[in-house]
Amino acid sequence: MKNIESTACVILNYNDADTTISLVRKIGDYKNIEHIVVVDNCSADHSLEKLEKISNEKVVVCQSPRNGGYGFGNNIGVQYAKEHYGAKYVLIANPDVEFEESLVSVLQNKMQQDRSIAVVSANQRGVDGQLKKSGWFLPGKAETILHGEVLCAILLDKIGGRKLGATPQSGWKFVDCVAGSLLMVDADVFLAAGGYDPEMFLYCEESTLGRKMMTLEKKTALYVSESYLHNHSVTISKSYNVKGQREQLLKSTLTYLKKYCDASKFEIHMASVLYKFGTLELMVIKEIKRLFRR
């Protein structure tokens, strides 16, 4: 095996400097990550001041010109890593994840061994130790529309999980999409594809990236023999309530349907109705849980 090409890690921060700093300190000594690029997505608090204090020869902190969301901010980070450090591989990490140095090596080696692969990741587990949705096949129009209603979403996720479960439970699986909480990309391919869609603020970026990779005839692979910890949505929850999250989800879903699924006006309308109904369902469920906790 020849030497691994340059690898950088991009961490996007928004109003959560303490979580971001904790991750930077944990991975700061990883020898297989040469540079860490922290992008502050125009936080509304004093995140930037805190983050600048951890800047050193390995860690650079930069600020996006505006809060353009997950995709916009990570695009800036990948571009910076490529232009300033010549990074071949970029590990995109949420601030609320934990992963071992050995996992980074596994991801690097896979990409270097198979140049047809442009995106890799591993299984993600929650703080409860349970396996979370880590990789999936590209959703079609019908699935995307129906996913707005809570019960349909649960059933569709179970069906999708069974499909992935039909393949071996160790080693590598080829999938269409991987979770955006932790993934490694080939920087050249990622940037050639235009990166994440900047019109999507918070959701659907994974499926959009999957479609872009398929268009370029590049593969996405998931390593299921190891996992990383994801304190799911701790950063998102600090910035958006349930209604706010659902509003962002609807906006991104409609963009995905229009730009990548050639959806009709009727299909767009149906998606809007189902997602708004799903929001009402979740708010009712939340209120019922609150009442029972009294």
Question: What is the predicted role of each segment?
Answer:
Residues 15-29:
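Short, well-formed alpha-helical segments that are part of the catalytic scaffolds
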Residues 17, 40-49, 66:
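A conserved acidic beta->alpha catalytic loop
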Residues 86-98:
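Short beta-strand-to-loop acidic/aromatic patch adjacent to the donor-nucleotide binding site
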Residues 98-134:
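Conserved donor NDP-sugar-binding/catalytic core segment of glycosyltransferases
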Residues 139-175:
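Short, flexible, basic/aromatic active-site loop/helix in glycosyltransferases
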Residues 208-290:
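Active-site-adjacent helix/loop segment of glycosyltransferases
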